[in-house]
Structure formats: C-alpha cells, structure tokens
C-alpha cells in the first residue's frame, strides 16, 4: 500500500493545452501541486503508476508522497479529471500539506453488518457515502466505519451518532446542531401498489336484475 501512495513526478515547463495533449499521447498525466503559501508547480507523472494507485480507496483519503527531483513532498489529492469513456486519467490536482497544520478531507464510509439491519424488513437508505472531516495529516483515517447491526426499523443514524477516530472532527457538526445530517436510515418498505391492469382484471360485481 505504501508503494502505491508514493509517486514519482517531474517538473514540467511546457504548458498549455497542446503540451498536455502531447503528454497524454506519451502516456503521461499532467498535474499541478499547490498549497501552503508556496508557488504552484506543474508536474508530469507516469499514467500507469497513477492509474494503478487511483484504484485504491486510500489514494483519495490518505497522505500521498510525490518524489519531485529526488525531494519527497507530502500532499493530498484534491481533484482528478477522468476521460468521459476511456480508462484514462486526464489531470491531477495535489494539495501540499504541512504535518503541523490541520487539513480538510473526505473520508469514505464503510457500512458494516448491513445485512443484519435489512433482516428487519427495512430498506436501508445511504444519505452519504463520505464524511467531510478535519484533522492533522497523521490522524487521517483511511475510512470511517459505521455498524448497522443494531439499526432498527424507522431509525436514522446522524453524524452525531458516528464514532470518529481520535483527533478527527466532522466539518458539518462544527457548524452547529442544525448541521447534524442524516447518514443512513432504515425505512419501512413501501406498500405494494395494485396495478391498473390487476384492477381491470378483477371481476365486476353483478348488477341486480331489473324487476
């Protein structure tokens, strides 16, 4: 896993759309690194390495290391542009980080024991699949687990019900009680609806005979 979160990068000076197209034709990915009040740096990475790394969930939530001219730089992935129908990464945005400064990130949610919750006959509705968090880089979780084993019909788990790892806080909860958003709920199944065709097929009551 550590190897996948470390990528070799080269500084590029040939900029513009034409230069980016040439890079992609050479199986490379244009990128930019910014943040921490330093000048942005335009970079180039090998597509095969990026594509392999981005298949891992941790790529989107953990600290990455870019080796730039032999110097390691820690960062987070902030944006990734993909080709609309090809398996091609078009561009990457990296945010430079400092170990002493808190970062904002999105932690994916892993829902545990969902089958147990569904045994109640409930429809399990996911209201979010990731949670916006703030923490120091060393405290970044790869994911946040939510156990649904005790979730009963009609219940909802909110952000305030989630157990966050030490040093990690919810961005929404930090805004106040009005931002205690629903994360997942167990809803009663909708009653089966009789179709119009079924109603039409039902035998009509016989009208009383005229006297």
From Swiss-Prot:
Residues 201-211 have a biased composition (Low complexity). Keywords: Ribonucleoprotein, Ribosomal protein, RNA-binding, rRNA-binding. GO terms for molecular function: 5S rRNA binding; structural constituent of ribosome. GO terms for biological process: translation. SUPFAM superfamilies: Ribosomal protein L25-like. Residues 188-211 are annotated as: Disordered. One of its GO terms (cellular component) is cytosolic large ribosomal subunit. InterPro entries: Rbsml_bL25/Gln-tRNA_synth_N, Ribosomal_bL25/Gln-tRNA_synth, Ribosomal_bL25_b-dom, Ribosomal_bL25_C, Ribosomal_bL25_long, Ribosomal_bL25_short, Ribosomal_L25_dom, Ribosomal_uL5_bac-type. Belongs to the bacterial ribosomal protein bL25 family. CTC subfamily. PANTHER family: RIBOSOMAL PROTEIN L25/GLN-TRNA SYNTHETASE, ANTI-CODON-BINDING DOMAIN-CONTAINING PROTEIN (PTHR33284), RIBOSOMAL PROTEIN L25_GLN-TRNA SYNTHETASE, ANTI-CODON-BINDING DOMAIN-CONTAINING PROTEIN (PTHR33284:SF1). HAMAP family: Ribosomal_bL25 (MF_01336), Ribosomal_bL25_CTC (MF_01334). Part of the 50S ribosomal subunit; part of the 5S rRNA/L5/L18/L25 subcomplex. Contacts the 5S rRNA. Binds to the 5S rRNA independently of L5 and L18. This is one of the proteins that binds to the 5S RNA in the ribosome where it forms part of the central protuberance. This is Large ribosomal subunit protein bL25.
